[in-house]
Amino acid sequence: MSHVDDGFRSLTLKRFPQTDDVNPLLAWEAADEYLLQQLDETEIRGPVLILNDTFGALSCALAEHSPYSIGDSYLSELGTRENLRHNGIAESSVTFLDSTADYPQAPGVVLIKVPKTLALLEQQLRALRKVVTAQTRIIAGAKARDIHTSTLELFEKVLGPTTTTLAWKKARLINCTFSHPQLADAPQTLNWKLEDTGWTIHNHANVFSRTGLDIGARFFMQHLPENLDGEIVDLGCGNGVIGLSLLAKNPQANVVFVDESPMAVDSSRLNVETNLPEAFERCEFMINNALSGVEPFRFNAVFCNPPFHQKHALTDNIAWEMFHHARRCLKINGELYIVANRHLDYFHKLKKIFGNCATIATNNKFVILKAVKQGRRR
């Protein structure tokens, strides 16, 4: 939990999920403060759009202006809602939209936290291009090290004249004025053929490894089990290639695709529709924080390629939460399979949670682990 006085409100903010007290990560950064310093409340005219507000620092500060919080992270939405409540601000003050929604017309102010993925930034700038005017104040912010020449060129190409500020507390801002430059249309998804399958994989802008199959998933797919039945889960599904493979290998199983990214879940849905349409009725698609709210003892197996970062921050909190949720939602003798970088040492984490862990396969970079839910039903 951390405190920030940004000139608009004095706020107490926390990350979501919360980090441990030993190595706490802040729920805001200098770029948030720097962005807010540029605004005079008396000059805000028209809708306020906030893009990629990780834990709600900007949304909480500008809540009295009824901002729209736009992004591709359900965790960020949950974190923002939690921080609104914690600071005594009505959740209804902020309208949440995912990045593929239609943005409000003629915004007065647009504040952008530059995302980690350049493809997501381009998708968002193209969406803004349809609604901003020459009078819209457009300001983006990030750590100085995360603003590159390619970032500035993208703003110039999609929106118009772009300048940068001096660095402040290692943060830098981008100021942009809309001039409606000529711009060719771009496809909504990036598509590629998955070797040895005949499948075409569709990827929205913010999907992990959208340009091709990542090597961890490739290794995982070589060791997926067959002859499963009942409900199984592709947890943190991304574009859904693991779940798609499970559908093909296990015709008696139903697959639940789960991710906190709306773009990921929509990519998974599209990939089942186009590649295994006959299996679509065996699928469920869920935007969720891991398996929050899912009933216990529901699933026969969970498959997971857990992230070890949240936006720009390295953390195993999300993976830890996924493992705990998986154990709660597995049936007795249900199995959790994960693929992970060897250096992360998830073997001992799983053994601590499940009381057991076995190595299924390993290479010089990755390991595939299996843990089984044991014990009596509680």
From Swiss-Prot:
One cellular-component annotation, GO: cytoplasm
Enzyme class: transferase
E.C. designation(s): 2.1.1.174
Top-level taxon: Bacteria
Chemical reaction(s) catalysed: guanosine(1835) in 23S rRNA + S-adenosyl-L-methionine = N(2)-methylguanosine(1835) in 23S rRNA + S-adenosyl-L-homocysteine + H(+)
Span of the signal peptide: none
Broad class of where this protein is predominantly found: cytoplasm
Gene3D superfamilies: Vaccinia Virus protein VP39 (3.40.50.150)
Keyword Manganese applies: no
Entry-linked InterPro entries: DNA_methylase_N6_adenine_CS, rRNA_m2G-MeTrfase_RlmG, RsmC/RlmG, SAM-dependent_MTases_sf, Small_mtfrase_dom
Keywords for the protein's UniProt record, in alphabetical order: Cytoplasm, Methyltransferase, rRNA processing, S-adenosyl-L-methionine, Transferase
Similarity field: Belongs to the methyltransferase superfamily. RlmG family.
Functional description taken from the UniProt entry: Specifically methylates the guanine in position 1835 (m2G1835) of 23S rRNA.
Name of the protein: Ribosomal RNA large subunit methyltransferase G
Top-level taxonomy: Bacteria, Pseudomonadati, Pseudomonadota, Gammaproteobacteria, Enterobacterales
